[in-house]
Amino acid sequence: MLASMFRFSDEKFSVTTPATAALRKTALNSIHRQLGAKMVNFGGWDMPLEYSGILAEHEAVRTRAGLFDVSHMGEIEIQGPGALGLVQLVSCNNAAKLAMGQAHYSGLMTSRGTFVDDLLVHKISDAHYMLCVNAGNQDQDYEHIVEHNKFDAKVENAGPRYSQLAIQGPRGKDILQRLTPMELDSIHYYHFAFGKVSGIDSLIARTGYTGEDGFEIYFAPEHSEKLWRDLMYAGGPAGMIPCGLGARNTLRLEAGMCLYGHEIDDTTTPWEAGLGWICKMEKAPFLGSDDLARQKKDGLKRKLVGFEMCDKRIGRDGYPVLIGSQEVGRVTSGGPAPFLKKNIGMAYVPPEFSAVGTDIVIGIRGQGEAARIVALPFYKRPQ
């Protein structure tokens, strides 16, 4: 029931069974199945959609803590004297401003100023950067970076060397602190450090995709089952539960975070997606910077907005957005916001219809349903 209520695009998710052999699997696949997770095909990976239910998992992350296996995410390492130059060319944020042990959100750009992908850039040293990229894009991202590597830099598609667990929620720090001698308060938001978690060498980053405080832990795959079990044991008394991709999606939607293939893709620019803050136009030219400068000067033809439904119906990905009887845009993501107890979504509309408070109509199976444009993000965690 809940899985259908919180459904995803058919192109991205389909139910899998133990007989599914062609899909890639994380090192925790057998654990997920032992826990009774509902497994789905996500970008060619056999991944848990939910364990105890999307509502319960969403609520746990907002109020306590949740543990996610996100080992399907890709890692690309760039090393050498030309590493910074290459990162600067292919991405729109300014990696030259990063300190060692700092990360930032950025876009991997096409020559047209649109997204190849969105990613996190971690500065390990002046000559070493680790990029965390989306699961379904990691091979094309690697090829794109290699294509533009005119620098003295080595590029490695390093995903097979990493597993990644994300512990998210207000109790996450205290749970993780039980397993590491590192003082986690010393790792600020969007920073990382190397240390041991449950005796396992790890990169511990204070990042996440839920709108909550939390940590993403990178480590060698052979330690996956031990670290998962140790974290779950440490988090049990605090009410931490395992969480799947379903809750990850509802959490990021409440937090107004973009999802590649929905809010952003290779037809979308950062300006349109409300991500102009990652476009550092003052740095040396990067892929697409000329087109981005021109778009900023000429003005936008569409903008990403948030909306709330006025009744109980849900505006899904691909549904039309109307002003009166005129279609002016399309929904990119939509669904229930369990913590806010509303039905919400994001859509692209022309700038003249983008003001907060604008009444719109979402076309749902041939019927017009009232909605209203609201400010993003829908949810901000308490400070």
Where on the chain are the PLM-derived regions?
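Conserved, structured C-terminal
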Residues: 3-43, 48-49, 124-383
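Acidic, proline/glycine-enriched N-terminal capping motif
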Residues: 2-106, 114-116
